[in-house]
Amino acid sequence: LLYNTAEVHKKMALAIANLWKQKLGARVELTNQEWKTYLDSRQSGQFEVIRSSWVADYNDPSAFLGLWGSGHSGNMARFANPAYDKLLAQAANSQDPAERARLFDEAEAILQKEAPIAPIYQYTNARLIKPWLKGYPINNPEDVAYSRQLYLVKH
């Protein structure tokens, strides 16, 4: 299991290795690499299993589902499925939100069935926000708050 250097990644790799050993009887070799080496290994496909993460750049299913298209540079699993690619292309060309949602649902069903990836956890950030601070974007997928959007109300 290849992972990049960070204490949180090491903990996750150890937890996965222990779980796979207990539940599957699998012997897992952990490989820790510094960021540049890790990126080289990831890009060249020199791994059997890799710990990776992704954060959406924008609030749309394509920000995640597009990663597994055959031609996407972020497709570390080297997943290739013509039906999946066709659904992504149709969704990209559709202007109808309901149709796009249906197409993305179908694409996601293919990912779930073929399992080229195994989502394990999701990063979270806790916030304590005073009730008189308004404009904080609670559902922002980038987890970014711009001061120009924030304002105070009388309390």
Predicted segment positions?
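Detector for C-terminal structural segments
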Residues: T5-L19, Y38-H155
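Short, well-ordered beta-strand elements
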Residues: L1-T5, V28-T31, E48
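A local structural motif
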Residues: N18-Q33, Q90
